[in-house]
Amino acid sequence: YYDAVDSLLTAMKDTTDKWVVRDSLVALSRRFGQVLTPKVQDVKIVTADFLIQNIDSAFVQWREGPWARHLDFEDFCEYLLPYKVEELQPLDDWRTHLRSFHPDHLDELAYCDLYRNSALQAGIKLNDNLWYYMKPGITDETIQLPVYRWRTRLRLPIGTCADYGNIATSVFRSQGIPVVMDFTPQWAFRSLGHSWNVLLAEDGKRMPFSGVCSNPGQPHKLGERMPKV
């Protein structure tokens, strides 16, 4: 299925209307979606070596990386440590794979005393790179059979807020930038809900943003009425 998606995206790479591409992806996923794949609980397949590798990698980013040193242990466990971002995510070495995504742009921050340890500035630069690379198109309609293979997923021209939020969370954590997902299941005045990211800045502020689409520090959905809690 993933190879078929890659082939479709390559064949339609010159198509300027991404919604035409979306319709083709939806049709393709429906065709493959008739094939049911078994779901297995993590506890039955996850290995000690996989968990140890994940813990070691996250711990090095926390203690030795430039953008997570301000986290206490509780925040580290929530914002950086988790071995996966979403359900059905392949249990592979995603941190190492995604760490190579535009690393040179982040390295530039090391030359500025004000920004070299700024999780906020690192997040802005990385999110800008994601936007430039993916050219996101927000849609409420998700494809029937999701794409989880990273080299294919980063090529998709459309996605839901949750799709882009999960992508951003994974890429940010791979670089040692502390980020989580948040959501509201239902808007107060219309159908559907919304998902977004939250970055824990070096000054302790929790800054909402839309992964791939809008940066931390920018106004986020100020025109939307919030439901009562």
Which residues fall in each region the model found?
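Secondary-structure boundary elements
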Residues: 1-156
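Hydrophobic/aromatic-rich core segments of domains that either
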Residues: 112-129, 138-151, 157, 162-229
